[in-house]
């Protein structure tokens, strides 16, 4: 070895030693190379799974390095060429830094000849999102074995932070491959799950210096990297000269991520860090470059804020630490920022510029886990067992091998006694079931007899709630109905008695609810007693619903401390044009309906028909154009149509043969619509009520409904990997992730406005949102009337039409509609937006299973199913959606908080 080489090695060793001293408490990837338990069986058989195996003797449990169990290795059932879909998966149970992998073929005492010459790795931190491992030059393929017996170790540069690791053997032709593996690394004690930062920039000197985070494994959108880890958490500390690197054959600036002061008018770079659990933070250490002769300076100061949950506000005053940006010593160094023991799961830190450039190579934290029982979040999605999945992102766990059990020989007497005891227990169980069934039959028969009375109010006490249902007389026969074809789902033969309907109908309150819906009003009934407040909790069967002002309470009020922050809306029957009740709204003053609608009369001659959007029981919805609208429409909002261009409007038309009650409801709907004044809610433009047919004219947006609009788009920067329907060859308009958040924020803003009026929109979904110019969103209400979305609604035994996939469990089982249930629907709508409306919510479940899942929420035994996280959705935003689906309505965030998060914090939170 030459003198120059020896000097270089000594210098490198000195630099690493200095870096370790500076970055106190930070891990050293060179020392993180312990075997993680495949060979010594610390990893149990149950944590090793495979896509398939040739036989039981080549199953997953035989894939341990240097093991000769079974036939000597794991061998997949099918060929790995050309699809490369066979994999071996290892679950480490906790996050680990994996720095090295070892592979081996099948030797089997000289009888085996199978091995893999190359392979790929995929890894996941949560079991939902899978990432391809790539080296520092973007290559995925790792060279493997050259013979069946030898062990080949491969350094992973960069290392990966993972809980689950999959090996995908490769071949260049159809051939058999077998594999044994081991993983090397150490436990990831930092607890850092991801960081968000602006994309690194390029510095132009005599040569281009690329200061990007080249190993970041999250998403990139709108100049922001989020949802992953990269070079700032890989343990590699940069050199004093940022143009040089400790890695071989890389570009100048590789070790650092940097930003120019000119690109940040605010004077600081903002980063956010997400951790695995609640922690008490003592110190943040940032390794910075200080080569001020080339423009790199230490930060002038740092300020950090903390919060405990994704949708919570930042707590208290920020922690400030002044640094000043040293000009003296040009060496790179680690700066320590004391954090004072503040507690949180999320940190937001701002690094102030003291010079032209900020260059960081590593950021680490010294913290302790805090055991706080109050910091709870909804559980991760759980899916019931089904057929073996075939996509890469599915988990397949092989059951632990069974050990032989010695059989004890018993006497015939003992066997006979055991059989008798079993028979007696079975008989007792059957008797108990029969008694329980008889009890419910009596309850239901009483409920049915009550429905037949001419005027009756029923009180049903449920733990913590009181449901008040009023039934008015009406015809016995339900309205005609033609079974819709579900959208995007195969046709199934319906069972004679659906399980989901049985679950609904087992609730006496819901039987009364459906009985009410089955009888449309046929005229004024007998006078209602003064003490009977007319209410109706029917689900989604008209356009608008309006609660009356409460009179004297029928029951004593609950204690003040038991009142949730969401109030239930008392509801009266209001059958609208499109046949579906949408809003539950506060009562109008007495006689307000009789005063007639606001006189914004619209000349029918100016309406030009374009197409029929939908129809309901009492009317239709048409899409029309209005010529020269500026001289016709007066409102509180400007009309964004150029002079000489027509205005698109939706016209709700009441059929001339509609009943008197339907006409009164139509006028009441006009009155309600006239009260809605918000930029994100469709507005009433005018009415035609001088002669038949009665019409109301509302906004309609040029880009149609949000569901159709988003499904025609693709997400920028190829973030949509894993979305249904995406293909490399698809050509179409794109939409950015920040724009999706902007869409969600507008929906939250409109719903916030409705909540301030105590309005409850009971059918919130992308089909009921309209898209205008510059992605303007307005919430509408006639999605139910469109045949295109018939598959989104479920008919309960031919009576109530319910959007059950968007409904909170208490709406499905108890008919309770509140602002909190709208928050639930908003979470589903946000899921639709982030999926670009490519999938129906719970698309893998039948309608009956969705209803049964609502029952699981009621039982609260941990078996309820949640919507899975969309591929492009950061974990923190998904946790916010899970909070929207909390079992207890009072635990769901209000719309003001949802709007603030989506409008201000979402892009900076992952």
Swiss-Prot record:
Subcellular location as annotated: Cell membrane
PPxY motif, short sequence motif: residues: 478-481
Modified residues (Phosphotyrosine): 481, 510, 517, 737, 789, 793-794
Residues involved in Ca(2+) 1 binding: 212, 231, 254, 256
PTM (free text): Autophosphorylated in response to fibrillar collagen binding.
All ranges on the Extracellular side of the membrane: 22-414
Entry keywords, A to Z: ATP-binding, Calcium, Cell membrane, Disulfide bond, Glycoprotein, Kinase, Lactation, Membrane, Metal-binding, Nucleotide-binding, Phosphoprotein, Pregnancy, Receptor, Signal, Transferase, Transmembrane, Transmembrane helix, Tyrosine-protein kinase
Keyword NAD: no
InterPro entries, sorted: DDR1-2_DS-like (IPR048525), FA58C (IPR000421), Galactose-bd-like_sf (IPR008979), Kinase-like_dom_sf (IPR011009), Prot_kinase_dom (IPR000719), RTK (IPR050122), Ser-Thr/Tyr_kinase_cat_dom (IPR001245), Tyr_kinase_AS (IPR008266)
Disulphide linkage map: 32-186, 75-178, 304-349
Gene3D superfamilies, A to Z: 2.60.120.1190, Galactose-binding domain-like (2.60.120.260), Phosphorylase Kinase, domain 1 (3.30.200.20), Transferase(Phosphotransferase) domain 1 (1.10.510.10)
Membrane-protein topology: Single-pass type I membrane protein
Domain F5/8 type C as annotated: residue spans: 32-186
GO cellular component terms given for this protein: basolateral plasma membrane; brush border; plasma membrane; receptor complex
Subunit description: Homodimer. Interacts (via PPxY motif) with WWC1 (via WW domains) in a collagen-regulated manner. Forms a tripartite complex with WWC1 and PRKCZ, but predominantly in the absence of collagen. Interacts (tyrosine phosphorylated) with SHC1. Interacts with SRC. Interacts with MYH9. Interacts with CDH1. Interacts with PTPN11. Interacts with NCK2.
Name recorded for this polypeptide: Epithelial discoidin domain-containing receptor 1
This protein's encoding gene: Ddr1
């Amino acid at each position: 070895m030459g003198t120059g080489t020896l000097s270089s090695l000594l210098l490198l060793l000195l630099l690493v030693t200095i870096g370790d001293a500076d970055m106190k408490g930070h891990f050293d990837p060179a020392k993180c190379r312990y075997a993680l338990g495949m060979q010594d069986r610390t990893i149990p058989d149950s944590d090793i799974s495979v896509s398939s195996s040739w036989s039981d003797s080549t199953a997953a449990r035989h894939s341990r390095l240097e093991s000769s169990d079974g036939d000597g290795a794991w061998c997949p059932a099918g060929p790995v060429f050309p699809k490369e879909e066979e994999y071996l998966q290892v679950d480490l149970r906790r996050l680990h830094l994996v720095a090295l992998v070892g592979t081996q073929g099948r030797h089997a005492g000289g009888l085996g000849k199978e091995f893999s010459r190359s392979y790929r790795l995929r890894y996941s931190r949560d079991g939902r999102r899978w990432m391809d491992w790539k080296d520092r030059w973007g290559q995925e393929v790792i060279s493997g074995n050259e013979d069946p017996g030898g062990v080949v170790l491969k350094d992973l540069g960069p290392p990966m932070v993972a809980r689950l690791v999959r090996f995908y053997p490769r071949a260049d032709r159809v051939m058999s491959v077998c594999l044994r593996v081991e993983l090397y690394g150490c436990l990831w004690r930092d607890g850092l799950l991801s960081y968000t930062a602006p994309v690194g920039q390029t510095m132009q000197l005599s040569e281009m210096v690329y200061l990007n985070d080249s190993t970041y494994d999250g998403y990139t959108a709108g100049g922001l990297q989020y949802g992953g880890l990269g070079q700032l958490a890989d343990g590699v500390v940069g050199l004093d000269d940022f143009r040089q690197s400790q890695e071989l054959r890389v570009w100048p600036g590789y070790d650092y991520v940097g930003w120019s002061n000119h690109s940040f008018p605010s004077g600081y770079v903002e980063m956010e860090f997400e951790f695995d659990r609640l922690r008490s933070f003592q110190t943040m250490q940032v390794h910075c470059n200080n080569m001020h002769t080339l423009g790199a300076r230490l930060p002038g100061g740092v300020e950090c804020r903390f919060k405990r949950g994704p949708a919570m506000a930042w707590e208290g005053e920020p922690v400030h630490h002044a640094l000043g940006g040293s000009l003296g010593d040009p060496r790179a160094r680690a700066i320590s920022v004391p954090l004072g023991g503040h507690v949180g799961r999320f940190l937001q830190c701002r690094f102030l510029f003291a010079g032209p450039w900020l260059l960081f190579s590593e950021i680490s934290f010294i913290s302790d886990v805090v055991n706080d029982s109050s910091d709870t979040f909804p559980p991760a999605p759980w899916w019931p067992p089904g057929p073996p999945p075939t996509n890469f992102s599915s988990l397949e766990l092989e059951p632990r091998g069974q050990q032989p059990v010695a059989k004890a020989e018993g006497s015939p007497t003992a066997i006979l006694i055991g059989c008798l005891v079993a028979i007696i227990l079975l008989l007792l169980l059957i008797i108990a079931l029969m008694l329980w069934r008889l009890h419910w039959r009596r309850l239901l028969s009483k409920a049915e007899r009550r429905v037949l009375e001419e005027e009756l109010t029923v009180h049903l006490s449920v733990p913590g709630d009181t449901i008040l249902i009023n039934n008015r007389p009406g015809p016995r026969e339900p309205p005609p109905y033609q079974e819709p074809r579900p959208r995007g789902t195969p046709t199934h033969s319906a069972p004679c008695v659906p399980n989901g309907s049985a679950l609904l109908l087992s609730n006496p309150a819901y039987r009364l609810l459906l009985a009410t819906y089955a009888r449309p009003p046929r005229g004024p009934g007998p006078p209602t007693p003064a003490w009977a407040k007319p209410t109706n909790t029917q689900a989604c069967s008209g356009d608008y619903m309006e609660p009356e002002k409460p009179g004297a309470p029928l029951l004593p009020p609950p204690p003040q401390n038991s009142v949730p922050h969401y109030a239930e809306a008392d509801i009266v029957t209001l059958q609208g044009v499109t046949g579906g009740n949408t809003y539950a709204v506060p009562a109008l003053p007495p006689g307000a309906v009789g005063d007639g609608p606001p006189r914004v009369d619209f000349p029918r001659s100016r309406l030009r028909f374009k197409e029929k959007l939908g129809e309901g029981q009492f009317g239709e919805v048409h899409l029309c154009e209005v010529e020269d609208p500026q001289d016709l429409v007066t409102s509180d909002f400007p009309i964004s149509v150029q002079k000489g261009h027509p205005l698109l409007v939706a016209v709700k038309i009441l059929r001339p043969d509609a009943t008197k009650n339907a006409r009164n409801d139509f006028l009441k709907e006009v009155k309600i619509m006239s009260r809605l004044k918000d930029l994100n809610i469709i507005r009433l433009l005018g009415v035609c009520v001088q002669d038949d047919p009665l019409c109301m004219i509302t906004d309609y947006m040029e880009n149609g409904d949000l569901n159709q609009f988003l499904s025609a788009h693709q997400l920028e920067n190829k973030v949509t990997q894993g979305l249904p329907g995406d293909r490399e060859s698809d050509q179409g308009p794109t939409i950015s992730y920040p724009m999706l958040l902007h869409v969600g924020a507008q929906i939250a803003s409109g719903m916030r406005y409705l909540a301030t009026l105590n309005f409850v929109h009971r059918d919130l979904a992308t089909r009921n949102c309209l898209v205008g110019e510059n992605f303007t969103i307005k919430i509408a209400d006639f999605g139910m009337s469109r045949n295109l979305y018939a598959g989104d609604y479920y008919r309960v035994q031919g009576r109530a039409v319910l959007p059950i996939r968007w409904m909170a469990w208490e709406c499905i089982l108890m008919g309770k509609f509140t602002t909190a249930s709208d928050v639930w629907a908003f979470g589903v709508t946000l899921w639709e937006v982030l999926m670009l409306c490519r999938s129906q919510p719970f698309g893998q479940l039948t309608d009956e299973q969705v209803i049964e899942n609502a029952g699981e929420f009621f039982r609260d035994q941990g078996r309820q199913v949640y919507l899975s996280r969309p591929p492009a959705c950061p974990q923190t935003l998904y946790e916010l959606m899970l909070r929207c689906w909390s079992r207890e309505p009072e635990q769901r965030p209000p719309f003001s908080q949802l709007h603030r998060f989506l409008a201000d914090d979402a892009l900076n939170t992952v």
